[in-house]
Amino acid sequence: MTGCAGRRDRGTGRRLWAAGPLLCAILTLSACGGVDRFTTAPPSAGGPAKPARTVAQTPATEREHERILSSYGGAYDDPRLEALIGKTVDRLVAASDRPDQAYKVTILNSGAVNAFALPTGQLYVTRGLIALASDTSELSSVLSHEMAHVLAKHATIREDQARQAAVVTRVVTDMGNDPDLTALALAKTKLTMASFSRAQEFEADGIGVGISARARFDPYGAARFLTAMERNAALKAGKTSLDPRAQDFLSSHPATPERVQNAQNSARQFSSPEGGERDRETYLAAIDNIVYGEDPSEGFVRGRRFLHPKLGFSFAAPETFTLDNTAQAVIGVREGGTQAMRFDVVRVPSEQTLSDYLTSGWMENVEKGSAEELTING
């Protein structure tokens, strides 16, 4: 990887720093802790090329797509990466049990390490995850894992399971006013859902490894990448007091030793003497010049300082604060979690003061008497 070059296509909801007043506040907390660039289609066996299948769109999935773009900095536009991912997904689709299923892939402009799928076949992968992978087989393991969730209809099944769990909890709650009984019901519901999600992840791993292997990619790519993600999370944890998994793949795809071992066991069933394809050189050439970490056009964090070269300003957080430049705002947390800071852009009605806005529900748990006004540089 070289430099910090690349092209971005921001989705709706991304911070527009010049759009309104800038708010920065130290808040006392209450006690407690892309645009869709390319579509894959089933390959035709000889004859004229068939038109690409399109992923079914509904108002709900369109809203979810826009929400995802807003949360992850919009779509990241890189033709070389798109070409590589398109070819990879085409091979995976042909090797899957449902070669008639179409997929639409969006690269997200986020340094977080994450990937996910909508039930319709819309797949999302962040440039942070792409940068962490070492070869095409590792990327294929992530894509095939998300395809497996679609093929196994995990989202639909999980929604049904959650609905049933909610009914059980409501029935138990309505049976009486025993808070201990209600708490026990809620705890059992959470445990059931966690166990259910864990089982789905293991199933998706097994299906995904099989798809990658049949597509002639190295089936051990999944285990290698799970290990890389865990090491990456541990490295981040040593540098920040914020949860490094907040927006990352590991928040919903825990890379436990058991899961890594499961991926290795699945790979052994498909490994051959000649091994599968890793395609490292092609992969490294495709990710050359990818933006790594934060998008400099949206500002970046260095230590306790936030800098925005494009708009020509910077500020430093108080000592013991850790900053995180998210898609929505710059967030700071004091060591121990007793105080937080948010640097944001809002449109305040002309008849409302900034102090009133700060205490009107902009953030939860803001002490109304804690808002103070000051003027900086006139």
Where are these regions (language model features)?
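A periodicity- and composition-biased signal for non-globular, repetitive helical segments
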Residues: 13, 20-21, 265
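Hydrophobic alpha-helical segments, especially transmembrane helices
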Residues: 15-16, 260
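Bacterial N-terminal signal peptides
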Residues: 19-30
